[in-house]
Amino acid sequence: MKKLLFKLFFALAFTSISLHGQEKIQQVEFSSFGGRALYSRHYTINFLYKEFEAKQVMGEPAELPKKILQLNPPDKWRVFTKKINLDKFKKLRDGPSEQTVDGQDEVIIIKTDKKTYRKMNAYSNDHDREVWYDLLQIIAKEFGKKGIYE
């Protein structure tokens, strides 16, 4: 009986430790800016809302969707965060700035209950590129788009 209680105690203790150690995603952001782009884009998704904002940087005044703000139902937020592999995102390596050759820099920021992770242009090799573009696809679908560049 003592052995059973001992095993049960340690099983509960290890379960508690492993559940306590998991980070919970609080917010995901994507921004693109710089280069010869006519406007910069910023997407924000959290458990309360989804937001898209475009700011014109240069060129002729254009009709842009300046700001879109939608409520984010809790069930959709749970589905969204389950699609994101935070461990893979943490391992991405920042790439060099694209603005040096008139390109746009892209930044993804994931805020958790414990830490904020920021990655810029993290698509320099095949593995990183796959993780990066998969995450961009997940973000785009939240806004009803086929791709983030649409």
Segments (PLM) and residue ranges:
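A short-motif feature that recognizes glycine-rich, charge-decorated loops
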Residues: K55-K90
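N-terminal export/targeting and maturation segments
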Residues: L19-Q56
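Short, well-ordered, aromatic-rich surface patches in folded extracellular/luminal domains
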Residues: L5, G21-G35, T81, K90-E150
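Bacterial Sec-dependent N-terminal signal peptides
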Residues: M1-K24
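Short beta-strand segments
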Residues: R41-Y43, P65-K67, K115-M120
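A short, structured loop/turn motif at beta-sheet edges
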Residues: F47, Q70-V79, I110-T116
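Short, surface-exposed coil-to-beta transition loops
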Residues: A37-H42, L64, D102-D105
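Short, low-complexity, polar/charged sequence segments that are solvent-exposed and flexible
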Residues: N46-F52, L64, P73-P74, K90, ...
